């Protein structure tokens, strides 16, 4: 349980060791973290340093326990330290950590991915960013075209050409979204609103025969959770193919999270290329991209498009990924879906009792909260809400032992490991959290 004694962090939990380690971390690491969202920048307060985890529970360095509704941003389908995954990793590491040569496990993981999705061939890489970067390069190499089209609010890793925000107008050249990215690097990136199929058509009309690919999250999870509307992905595929372009669906987040077959299991759209991450690694650093064989065969050494990686197909990560996919049966997904429905209901009931305008955004078992009436369909909708209510809501949950995503624009993830006791703890924590959200002012 969380120690509710006062602490100098401004929270009601004892987080003295997290404070100590965060101050030390800032001496050696920019901002004290290795990925920005971990710093609690958008919600304020003290980031928790996690010591260990099991099942649905995170335990920080001060001994505080939390019900985990982040699941390492998606991959922990069955909770932390799942016995089958740990056994596979432990069995593999005694034979070596990395060989820089082909292994049987690489072939077997590729087969596992192919058997559950629409892709015909797979290349293993080390991160979701690397997967999307490689897929875009491959699309450009295959089509011999320079431009790419992406959607405002969709995140595809920190690739220079994809880390771009929308400028003005319906179909527009992108503006760099970070210092260090030049206009030249985003000049060939077109950004349009998500779920706006007419904006996509307008972009292709403005740049006929120039767009190599459309890249989109299969279901958006980085502007909050926003599901594709009205057969959006299907229309994207048709528009791309009519112009000779490709469709890349980014399933780094949704792949093997939203169903046994990922988002492909939801809408059955056979994209030309698909990127995977998170679940395919079992929580270790690994990812993949795949697609139609004629496109994938453009990759070196078979074709001219270069892509490589010393640690790609790392045997330990491959073992974890295979074990995770194997253990994630259809029954596991039914449990995850039911748990997401249960969490949805608890959050909505608590906010309704306090009169807080809200909509629970859903994409299968992924969810987030929009603090406004009605469903958000794009990034503008998600920003046009009472986002100021989220920080006090988040901290009340955290102080009562519930670990939610530390940003209103991040997706909540549940595991099959959640118990009735966990849901009771969540329900209890939602009482002060909803009150805090109701009392918040801009």
Swiss-Prot record:
Q: Name the Gene Ontology molecular function terms of this record.
A: glutamate-1-semialdehyde 2,1-aminomutase activity; pyridoxal phosphate binding; transaminase activity
Q: Which UniProt keywords apply?
A: Cytoplasm, Isomerase, Porphyrin biosynthesis, Pyridoxal phosphate
According to UniProt, the reaction catalysed is: (S)-4-amino-5-oxopentanoate = 5-aminolevulinate
UniProt xrefs under PANTHER family: GLUTAMATE-1-SEMIALDEHYDE 2,1-AMINOMUTASE (PTHR43713), GLUTAMATE-1-SEMIALDEHYDE 2,1-AMINOMUTASE 1, CHLOROPLASTIC-RELATED (PTHR43713:SF3)
User: Where located?
Assistant: Cytoplasm
Q: Name one Pfam family in it.
A: Aminotran_3
Which lineage do the record's taxonomy fields give for this organism? Bacteria, Bacillati, Actinomycetota, Actinomycetes, Mycobacteriales
Similarity section: Belongs to the class-III pyridoxal-phosphate-dependent aminotransferase family. HemL subfamily.
Protein name per UniProt: Glutamate-1-semialdehyde 2,1-aminomutase
């Amino acid at each position: 349980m969380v120690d509710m004694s006062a602490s100098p962090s401004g929270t009601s939990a004892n987080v003295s060791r997290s404070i100590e380690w965060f101050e030390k971390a800032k001496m050696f690491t920019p901002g004290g973290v290795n990925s920005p969202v971990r710093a609690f920048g958008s919600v304020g307060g003290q980031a928790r340093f996690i010591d260990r985890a099991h099942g649905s529970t995170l335990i920080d360095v001060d001994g505080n326990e939390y019900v985990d509704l982040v699941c390492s941003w998606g991959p922990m389908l069955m909770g932390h330290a799942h016995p089958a995954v740990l056994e596979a990793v432990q069995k593999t590491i005694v034979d070596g950590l990395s060989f820089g040569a082909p292994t049987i496990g690489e072939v077997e993981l590729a087969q596992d991915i192919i058997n559950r999705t629409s892709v015909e061939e797979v290349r293993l890489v080390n991160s979701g960013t690397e997967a999307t970067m490689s897929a875009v390069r491959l699309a450009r190499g295959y089509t011999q075209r320079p431009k790419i089209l992406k959607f405002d609010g969709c995140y595809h890793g920190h690739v220079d050409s994809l880390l771009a925000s929308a400028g003005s107008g319906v179909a527009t050249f992108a503006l760099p979204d970070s210092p260090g990215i030049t206009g030249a690097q985003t000049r060939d990136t077109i950004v349009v609103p998500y779920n706006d199929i007419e904006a996509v058509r307008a972009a292709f009309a403005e740049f006929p025969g120039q767009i190599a690919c459309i890249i989109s999250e299969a279901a958006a999870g980085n502007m909050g959770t926003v599901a594709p509307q009205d057969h959006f992905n299907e229309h994207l595929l048709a528009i791309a193919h009519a112009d000779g372009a490709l469709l890349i669906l980014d399933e780094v987040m949704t792949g093997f999270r939203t169903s046994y077959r990922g988002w492909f299991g939801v809408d059955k759209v056979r994209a030309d290329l698909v990127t995977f991450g998170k679940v395919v690694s079992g929580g270790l650093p690994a990812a993949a991209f795949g697609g139609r064989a004629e496109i994938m065969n453009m990759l070196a050494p078979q074709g001219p498009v270069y892509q490589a990686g010393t640690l790609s197909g790392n045997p330990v990560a491959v073992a974890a990924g295979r074990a995770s996919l194997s253990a994630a049966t259809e029954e596991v997904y039914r449990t995850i879906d039911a748990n997401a429905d249960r969490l949805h209901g608890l959050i909505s009931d608590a906010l309704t009792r306090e009169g807080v305008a809200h909509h629970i955004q859903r994409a299968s078992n992924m969810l987030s909260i929009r603090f406004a009436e009605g469903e958000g369909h794009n990034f503008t909708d998600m920003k046009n809400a009472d986002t100021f209510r989220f920080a006090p809501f988040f901290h009340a949950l955290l102080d009562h032992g519930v670990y939610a995503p530390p940003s209103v624009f991040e997706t909540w993830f549940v595991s099959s490991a959640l118990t009735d006791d966990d849901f009771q703890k969540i329900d209890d924590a939602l009482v002060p959290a909803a009150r805090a959200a109701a009392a918040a002012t801009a």
